[in-house]
Amino acid sequence: MNSLLLCIPFAGLLLCIAVMPLVKPEWWEKHQALAVIVWSLLFIIPSIVLNGAGETTETVLECIVNDYLTFIVLLFGLFCVSGNITLEGNLAGSPAVNALFLAFGTLLSSCIGTTGASMLLVRPMIKMNSWRKNKAQIMIFFIFMISNMGGCLTPIGDPPLLMGFMRGVPFFWSLHLFPILIFNMILLLIIFYLIDKKQYRKDIANGLRPDISKPGVDIKVEGLHNIVFLVAIVVAVILSGTLPSLPMFQDAAGNVLGITIYKSVKLTFPAMIEIAIILLAALLSFKTTNEKIRTQNHF
């Protein structure tokens, strides 16, 4: 029961993140750090009372070192590398084009993460629908499909799968969700197409037309060499799950070697290798990419 009660601050923090930007956006913008501190203290203080300061410190450090650190480094790497790739084109935001774009982005999310796919595709999606007035549904489905649902096939895609992988779940285990993903993707695409087609007809009836500079389809991708760095990040994540099983990374008792932070909390050598590879990939991405690309991405 006590363990369940200690979950309340986490649920409260998630609700704040989801609701406050909509209800009190200005307050949230200024005080989100304070909200995180308050909810964290609402966990830490009762935990100290129930379990003692030592166990609470160990629990908090375990979460920071073995969960949060590698997770945030992965997001940082995907965000940086994806920000150095730009997708340009003269596509017009019709229902069919938007649906195909959403389908592509949904499948891409499991390859470069929901963060990476969203970073790469949100600007082209906004640009090709900039001529339209009735378009709120486009970004809603973008968030549903590309920023959330699409990452369900690999630990690269979604944070919960990454944490499962860090706890020993096989990297490709979640591929069995592929039929479910396809079913839901098709269902959502049908719903989206019907809604978008109705709104599209309203825009056309109001005299709105896409501004396409030249006939045909002209799509240009810059910064493609960054795919190498995305692959490096994927390899780093896979290594973090496979290296701990190698004898060279274990002591005589079979424990994974690393730097002890506090009691049983340890930053393992495989985790350090993963972090180093991801940070190196992000650094090389910045060093080898023209700044113009980042400017185009508003990055």
Place the predicted regions along the sequence by residue:
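Cytoplasmic-side transmembrane-helix entry/capping segments in multi-pass membrane proteins
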Residues: E29-S40, V65, L69, L91-A103, ...
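Hydrophobic core segments of alpha-helical transmembrane domains in multi-pass membrane transport
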Residues: P9-M20, W39-L50, L75-G83, I182-L194, ...
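Hydrophobic transmembrane alpha-helices that form the pore/transport pathway of multi-pass ion
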Residues: A96-G150
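C-terminal ends of transmembrane helices
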Residues: L15-W28, L78-G93, I126-N129, F192-K198, ...
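Interfacial loop-to-helix junctions that mark the boundaries of transmembrane helices
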Residues: M1-L6, W27-A35, T56-L69, F171-I180, ...
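Transmembrane alpha-helix boundary signature
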Residues: P25, I44-D67, F76-S94, L107-L120
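Transmembrane helical segments that form the transport core of multi-pass membrane transport proteins
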Residues: L230-F299
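Juxtamembrane and boundary regions of transmembrane helices in multi-pass small-molecule transporters
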Residues: N134, L153-T154, F172-V221
